[in-house]
Amino acid sequence: MKLVLMGLPGAGKGTQAEQIVEKYNIPHISTGDMFRAAMKNNTELGKKAKSFMDNGDLVPDEVTNGIVRERLAEDDAKNGFLLDGFPRTVEQAAELENILSDLGTELDAVINIEVDKDVLMKRLTGRWICRTCGKTYHEIYNPPKVAGKCDLDGGELYQREDDKKETVENRLNVNMKQTKPLLDFYSEKGKLHSINGEQDINDVFVDVEKILASF
C-alpha cells in the first residue's frame, strides 16, 4: 500500500499517520526524517542538502527528489509506505510519479484530512505554556483551572509567537495556497480521497480504513 498523507497544520495528520503505519505495517516516511538520515549517513545528496540548510536556503527540488528516490528504493518501502510532507508542489508530484514508475509501481491513494480554517485556528491558537514549569494548556481542550495561571505552580501562562493568531493565520493561508494545485493534480488522477478531520480521532481513522479497504 503506497500512500501520500496530506492535511493543513492542526488537521491531525500526525495522529492518523501513527495509526496507519501501525495497522498496515508500512514505514512512515517524512521529509524531515529523510533529510536527517541522508545527512547522518553522509550520502552525496545528504551533504548537498546540509550545505543548503546550513546557509538557511531551501533545498532545491533536484536534491529533495533524489533523496526521496533513494529512500523509496530501500527494501522496507517495497511493499508500501506512507509519505508525509512530500510532495509539496505539482512538480514534485510529477517527479514522484516518475520515481515510482522507475521502481515499477505507482501510488495507491492520496488521503487528505480536511478541517475548516476556523476550526484549525481554534486548535492552533489555543495553546498556552507555563513560564515556570513549561506545562502546556489549551483554551478549549485542556484549560487551566484559573485563567492565565498554571494549575501546578501558579506560574504565568504565555503564548509562543508561533501560536499567535496573526502568525497562525498567515501559515494557514500560505499552506492553503500551496496545497490547492496539488489537490487538483491528484483529483484529476483519481487518486484523491478527502476525509472529514473535524470528527473524533477514532472516527477519522474509521474513514481512513474504509478507503484503504479497497487496496
Curated annotation (Swiss-Prot):
Gene: adk
Keywords: ATP-binding, Cytoplasm, Kinase, Metal-binding, Nucleotide biosynthesis, Nucleotide-binding, Transferase, Zinc
Cellular compartments annotated: Cytoplasm
GO molecular function, one term: zinc ion binding
Gene3D superfamilies for the chain: P-loop containing nucleotide triphosphate hydrolases
Matches recorded under Pfam families: ADK (PF00406), ADK_lid (PF05191)
LID as annotated region, ranges: 126-163
InterPro entries named among the record's database cross-references: Adenyl_kin_sub, Adenylat/UMP-CMP_kin, Adenylat_kinase_CS, Adenylate_kinase_lid-dom, P-loop_NTPase
GO BP annotation list: AMP salvage
Protein name, UniProt field: Adenylate kinase
Species: Listeria welshimeri serovar 6b (strain ATCC 35897 / DSM 20650 / CCUG 15529 / CIP 8149 / NCTC 11857 / SLCC 5334 / V8)
Subunit relationships: Monomer.
